[in-house]
Amino acid sequence: MAGYLNNIALNLEIVLKNKADSPEVSETLVTRICENLLLSKEVSFLKADGSVENFKLSDMEYEITNTEELPE
């Protein structure tokens, strides 16, 4: 059976709300989460039918924006 090689660019927008005391601490927390995701090298997606499909990650990049204080 022949195989196919696909290069896919996937942009995910993830909003994380945390209890950090400052924008710097908040950015540090989110950076740590992104770096751990970089190390995982695999992500799993839950399909509508309940099955799970795993995808290998390579050359992943991230950018953190809009670290701001939330109103209480």
Curated annotation (Swiss-Prot):
InterPro entries associated with the record: YopT, YopT_sf
Organism name: Bacillus subtilis (strain 168)
Gene3D superfamilies, per database record: Protein of unknown function YopT
Self-association and partners: Homodimer.
Name of the protein described by the UniProt record: SPbeta prophage-derived uncharacterized protein YopT
Organism domain of life: Bacteria
Gene behind the chain: yopT
